[in-house]
């Protein structure tokens, strides 16, 4: 799992379907001419894993079940619900997390809460990630060279929010949810030589500023009859998603 999605048995990118609560995620868009110079943002929007309750991974072609784009396999995320964050016998729950790693100086902060009261279920989750380039054992000063051992400097910040509210009566449940994510990455490209060079030897070939912005809206009606001999569950979804990918590269 990486910047361009999942790789299953050697198949990756748009050939592996990714969906969240049944809604397919945006695919990568790659320009063959500009991508070789790092001038286009070919990343695939990533869903915040702190909001995930369950992951289903299927290998092999499954386009009949998951639609186009599932040549190599399919991955379906299922997001958290209010009752998954609340202990039995309570009507509310709060969770928080602080973590990090030394390899990329990464940090993660998450905070959320949920409440269940008289058929009403609600939750709100927020997560923020920051980090830098993955460090290696490269030495020497940072210089323009395709043979450089030090990684190109990079810094990113990702902010995500998930909100849900639901009302349950009898065998029926109506849920509305909203999800947003904004990831900004600033980088310096020292190791990828362009077709022309206009900068001095003491500056990078390129300065990069990439942004990935995602918003999605969901309304779900679920009917689960307890005494039906022919119907197990009925689901009706109305959803929408907007994804914006921007790459600002300058020398």
Each language-model region and where it sits:
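Transmembrane beta-strand segments of Gram-negative outer membrane beta-barrel proteins
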Residues: 53-54, 72-74, 79-102, 122, ...
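Short loop/turn motifs that connect adjacent beta-strands in outer-membrane beta-barrel proteins
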Residues: 47, 66-67, 82-92, 119, ...
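Acidic, small-polar-rich N-terminal luminal/periplasmic segments of exported/outer-membrane proteins
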Residues: 1-85
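Membrane-embedded beta-strands of outer-membrane beta-barrel proteins
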Residues: 6, 55, 94, 110-111, ...
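Periplasmic-side early beta-strands and strand-to-turn transitions of outer-membrane beta-barrels
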Residues: 91, 104-108, 112-209
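Structural signature of outer-membrane beta-barrel domains
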Residues: 13, 25, 80, 101-103, ...
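Transmembrane beta-barrel architecture of outer-membrane proteins
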Residues: 3, 42, 70-72, 91-93, ...
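Face-selective signature of the C-terminal outer-membrane beta-barrel domain
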Residues: 168-181, 212-251
């Amino acid at each position: 799992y990486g910047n361009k999605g999942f790789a299953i048995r050697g198949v990756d990118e748009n050939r592996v379907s990714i969906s969240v609560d049944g809604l397919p995620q945006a695919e990568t868009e790659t320009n063959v001419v500009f991508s070789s110079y790092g001038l286009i943002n070919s990343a695939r929007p990533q869903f915040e894993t702190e909001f995930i309750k369950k992951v289903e991974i299927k290998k092999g072609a499954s386009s009949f079940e998951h639609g186009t784009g599932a040549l190599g396999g399919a991955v379906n995320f299922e997001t958290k619900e209010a009752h998954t964050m609340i202990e039995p016998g309570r009507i509310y729950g709060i969770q928080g997390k602080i973590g990090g790693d030394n390899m990329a100086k990464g940090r993660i902060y998450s905070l959320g809460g949920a409440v269940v009261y008289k058929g009403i279920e609600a939750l709100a989750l927020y997560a923020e990630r920051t980090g830098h380039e993955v460090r290696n054992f490269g030495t020497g000063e940072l210089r323009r060279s395709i043979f450089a051992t030090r990684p190109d400097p990079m810094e990113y910040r990702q902010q995500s929010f998930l909100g849900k509210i639901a009302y349950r009566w009898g065998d029926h449940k109506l849920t509305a949810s909203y999800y947003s994510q904004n990831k900004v990455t600033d980088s310096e490209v020292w190791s990828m030589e362009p077709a022309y060079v206009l900068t001095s030897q003491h500056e990078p070939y390129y300065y990069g500023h990439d942004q990935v912005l995602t918003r999605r809206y969901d309304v779900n009606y679920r009917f689960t009859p307890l005494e039906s001999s022919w119907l197990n569950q009925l689901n009706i979804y109305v959803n929408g998603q907007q994804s914006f990918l921007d790459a600002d590269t300058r020398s």
